[in-house]
């Protein structure tokens, strides 16, 4: 079945104008559709599981603002709380009682967090936690994993996933080799490689940081024993274990990936969901480590808008919605139905596919599985994914515009939305086979 051609005239006009105003016409690279081809859409509004572009086309959305919209876009209770909060001001630049409330909720939920510091983005949280790892241990080196993305700070732009090329050197011009000299990399799910790095760098490694489920190199789950092995290795070598839960935090369970897998790190970074759609980040962990942070301790970190009342309000209301009984069971059922249907549709069209899901996070690769690390992820047929992405847009489904990004469901996605999405996949896979 051939899908009708969408009218995206206004999107094209706006994007053309944007390219003279902003680098590449966007405020974040993946939005430019470079890896999937075609013109990016310019959105006008979002509500629930849907997004509308400036030409009036409606889409079922599986990006969810790249993760925050777990309750659905513009949830009425979140909007109502924000409307009330904004009457009191948008930012105080001073302590705010709402910070206490959200901090208590995060500490109660996340096993590793005994104290928390709010910032304004996941990148900012990861930058701060890197400094904290070094300050606490007195060591400079850090281990990260190929394909894991921890924001755009210089130190982390090494084999960083999110479509960034993996060259073994800094992944962006402007990042000095001296800056990344202390960044050690290993393949995800490879404990032996981590053991080797510790052996080659005795008493020099401050810690290991990773996405407990990789979401920026597609969707890659930890193999049994991998997270547990990292926990043992870091303890053995006096290093810290850090989970970057910017994506997984409050998404795959109320306590994040660490609660889901039963492995407690020393420090955790968060973002996305805890801001309910507003800019936010956080890092937290053991009290003895967090007390290194200024003004309690000597490690300096600050932020003009950190802990602002609007982000705190949206975060509080979002977590209140998520802790209601049955929330994660519903998210799991929705996402499992979706990914099972996607794999069935690809197989019916004679296309190779592998993929999976955990709660409200999913992903697939257009190749034979298994995919256990970034090197194996690169076997996916990115060109065919681009064709799939365009075919799905024509049928009213908005997927991440990259073969190397996880997808997200929400409490707002209905059975009808899932079935409409799967029908679009059936038609699209048949079209591109």
From Swiss-Prot:
Cofactor(s) of this protein: pyridoxal 5'-phosphate
CDD domains found in the cross-reference section: OAT_like
PROSITE patterns (alphabetical): AA_TRANSFER_CLASS_3 (PS00600)
Alphabetized InterPro entries for the sequence: 4pyrrol_synth_GluAld_NH2Trfase, Aminotrans_3, Aminotrans_3_PPA_site, PyrdxlP-dep_Trfase, PyrdxlP-dep_Trfase_major, PyrdxlP-dep_Trfase_small
A GO MF label: pyridoxal phosphate binding
SUPFAM superfamilies, per the entry: PLP-dependent transferases
Transmembrane segments: none
UniProt modified residues of type N6-(pyridoxal phosphate)lysine: 272
Main location: cytoplasm
Recorded catalytic activity of this chain's protein: (S)-4-amino-5-oxopentanoate = 5-aminolevulinate
Record-stated family: Belongs to the class-III pyridoxal-phosphate-dependent aminotransferase family. HemL subfamily.
Name of protein: Glutamate-1-semialdehyde 2,1-aminomutase
Gene: hemL
